[in-house]
Amino acid sequence: MIIGTGVDIVEIERIATLIKRQERAIKHFLTTDEQQLLHGKSETRQAEMVAGRFAAKEAGAKALGTGIGAVLSFLDMEILPNHLGKPVMTIKNEVYSKLDLDPTRVHIHVSISHSQSHAIAQVIVEER
């Protein structure tokens, strides 16, 4: 059963500007492991990666029906590539408790795409 779907789009330049102005802003959006993915990447690629994860986390919050706020923060969600490079979203167990969901029964589908100017993400949250 599908619990919810979410889509978000973000301007990559907006994220690039934010990163340049406030480097610590990345720590607000990305977990430590997600930040590690940025090492060795060009500024352009870093902005794309941060924008894509920002959009995916916003989409995930929409799919869960909470938005970003009291129940769910950017750091409650983590998006890391699997062995094939596919983005996999995990959510902290405390969030599942707040939402009265069983984490062993929830599957999250994530798709992230970029153009030169935008990053877009779609998330589907499914309970099995």
Swiss-Prot record:
InterPro entries: 4-PPantetheinyl_Trfase_dom, 4-PPantetheinyl_Trfase_dom_sf, ACPS, Ppantetheine-prot_Trfase_dom. Keywords: Cytoplasm, Fatty acid biosynthesis, Fatty acid metabolism, Lipid biosynthesis, Lipid metabolism, Magnesium, Metal-binding, Transferase. It comes from the Bacteria. GO terms for molecular function: holo-[acyl-carrier-protein] synthase activity; magnesium ion binding. It is found in: Cytoplasm. Its EC number is 2.7.8.7. GO terms for cellular component: cytoplasm. The keyword Lipid metabolism applies. Its cofactor is Mg(2+). It catalyses: apo-[ACP] + CoA = holo-[ACP] + adenosine 3',5'-bisphosphate + H(+). GO terms for biological process: fatty acid biosynthetic process. The keyword Acyltransferase does not apply. Transfers the 4'-phosphopantetheine moiety from coenzyme A to a Ser of acyl-carrier-protein. Belongs to the P-Pant transferase superfamily. AcpS family. NCBIfam families: acpS, pantethn_trn. This is Holo-[acyl-carrier-protein] synthase. It comes from Brevibacillus brevis (strain 47 / JCM 6285 / NBRC 100599). The lineage of its organism: Bacteria, Bacillati, Bacillota, Bacilli, Bacillales. The gene is acpS.
